[in-house]
Structures are given as C-alpha cells and as structure tokens.
Amino acid sequence: MFWRRDLVDWSVGSNAVRVLGRQSQDEDPTDFARQIGVYLLHDGARTIYAGRVSSPRLGARLAEHTKDRLSGRWDRFSWFGLRPVLSTGVLGEAGSNFGTDLVVATMEAILIEGLEPPQNRRQGDGMTGQEFTQAEDPSLQEQDLIATLLRQLQSRGR
C-alpha cells in the first residue's frame, strides 16, 4: 500500500510518468499513471496530504507534488483508484453507478488502509485481492546501470 517515491522516474515530465504496479512478481506491471481516485502523501509513517484526481492523471498529479510546496516533505504515497485493471493488464473505465453500501464500505476501507488506526483489528472490506504492489520503473534501473558503468570507466582512467 505504501509506494516509494524513489521508485518512480519523475525526470521524464509529468505527462510521461509511469506509476507501475503488479499483483505478483511473475506479471508484467500495469501503469496506474492514468488512474482516478484518491491518494495520500506520506513522510515516513505520517500522512501529510490527501488529494483526489477525478480525471485520469494520478501520475501527473503526483509529479506536480515533486515540484510544489510539498516536494521535500514526502517520501511515499498511497492511492486508491476507481479504474479496474482488465485481464489485458491495462486500466478499464470506472463504473458509473455505485450503491450506497458499496460507497460507505469503500470509504471505510480507504480510511482503515490509509490511516492504519491501531484499534481496528481487520482490513477494510473488499480490499483483499485488489492490492497492487509497486514495481520499480525500469528506466531507473537503466540510469543506475549507466551511472555505475561511468563511475567504473572514470576510476580506470585515473
């Protein structure tokens, strides 16, 4: 649920950011950058900001927070989206009709999962089986490899 800020390549510009996640290690990652829903910014264990995206731009909104007044204040984020992941691994369209019971249960689940209140003994209803864990953006791995190779070349040249 807590995704690391440093595993996203923010250098590509807000419209090209990828927010990658998967349910299991053997799956190709899904890009959640065009998700809609709510998100939380965290500094360690403390939640410092709650926001929403009602158009498909979660990645762009998070990227904006890397440059605004909150930029130095968060190192992790959580998000809760409305667009389902289809069997093809891409985001589908959000449903348009939600019953009151589902909305209330979802609100409770988001509060329980996001705030982790110590007196709640269970997870929020309906959250199991729908959680995706973060996948590091492969471009960051490539950047690390290039930096390592450059350091090795520089140390040999001395």
Predicted region positions:
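Boundary/linker segments flanking structured domains
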Residues: 1-36, 40-48, 54-158
